[in-house]
């Protein structure tokens, strides 16, 4: 997560600068290629330590970009190149755990190997006890596609388990969502948001490499360690308590004890008559221990005055 945020800022800087130079004077335009190569080489070097906000590398990055703006005779916004962005950093402690239980048989998820989990709620301690696990298919409510995986079920306080992507990808049918092209309904961000709107206590997306578009290692590396987010007035209480991913192979192993079959669940989720249902006897227990830190990050912005 940290790297995702810093890469976004890094790429936005390069894109903005390249557009700006192209539209400015001939002297700048003539050196666009060389300058971009220099900036990319510099910012991607080990000296900048990953460029993460709230770190020494982040500070070096901000100073480098602001100096570059100044060297290009760009104007600061309201007297400063730095625009304040109140940020929270939540780090999951090792004492946290996630357990799936079936009729007294507990399976503790090994962080990184079996599953990853976190909370967007900026609190030092959260817990979930004996939360009923519900399979909600793709976890989508899309009136324009006449699709509602949550219709007829109350998941308040429960744990929803969700397939990644959307039904169009699984079937390849162009008239079903957008075929193989993922819609926003297929993204994990939407699935967590919808689960929160439905009042779920926890939401876990099932990772399949083909459907997700990336291997498990991406999930493992992105969601462990400090997680950055915007500071929120409600401390993130509008989110579910626990968000996470589980490997498809891990879930399949768990389901083998319950009498359910993972491949069968995927097929059922594509039926027009699909209704979400409880995975009877399967419950989730979790304790989340966080280190919460608040910091002042920055966006860096500048402009060049036009001639008219």
List where the protein language model places each region.
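Bacterial N-terminal signal peptides
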Residues: 12-22
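Acidic/His- and Gly-rich active-site-bordering loop/insert found
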Residues: 43, 69, 103, 247, ...
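Noncatalytic luminal/extracellular "stalk/propeptide" segments of secretory-pathway proteins
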Residues: 49-174, 278, 287, 297-299
């Amino acid at each position: 997560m940290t790297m995702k945020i810093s890469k976004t800022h890094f790429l936005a800087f390069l894109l903005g600068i390249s557009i700006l130079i192209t539209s400015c004077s001939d002297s700048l335009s003539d050196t666009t290629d060389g300058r971009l190569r220099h900036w990319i080489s510099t910012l991607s070097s080990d000296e900048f330590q990953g460029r993460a906000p709230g770190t020494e590398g982040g500070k070096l990055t901000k100073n480098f970009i602001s100096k570059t703006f100044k060297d290009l005779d760009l104007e600061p916004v309201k007297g400063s190149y730095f625009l304040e962005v109140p940020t929270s950093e939540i780090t999951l402690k090792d004492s946290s755990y996630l357990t799936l239980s079936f009729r007294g048989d507990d399976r503790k998820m090994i962080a990184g190997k079996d599953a990853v989990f976190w909370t967007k709620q900026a609190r030092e301690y959260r817990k979930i006890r004996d939360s009923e696990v519900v399979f909600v298919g793709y976890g989508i409510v899309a009136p324009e596609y006449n699709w509602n995986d949550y219709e007829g079920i109350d998941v308040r306080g429960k744990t929803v388990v969700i397939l990644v992507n959307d039904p169009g990808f699984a079937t390849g049918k162009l008239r079903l969502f957008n075929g193989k092209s993922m819609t926003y309904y297929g993204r994990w961000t939407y699935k967590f948001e919808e689960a929160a709107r439905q009042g779920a206590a926890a939401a876990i997306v099932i990772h399949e490499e083909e459907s997700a578009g990336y291997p498990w290692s991406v999930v493992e590396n992105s969601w462990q360690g400090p997680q950055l987010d915007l500071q929120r007035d409600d401390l993130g209480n509008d989110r579910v308590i626990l968000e996470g991913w589980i490997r498809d192979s891990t879930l399949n192993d768990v389901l083998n004890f319950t009498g359910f079959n993972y491949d069968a669940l995927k097929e059922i989720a594509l039926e027009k008559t699909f209704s979400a249902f409880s995975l009877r006897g399967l419950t989730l227990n979790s304790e989340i221990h966080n280190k919460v830190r608040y910091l002042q990050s920055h966006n860096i912005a500048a402009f060049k005055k036009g001639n008219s």
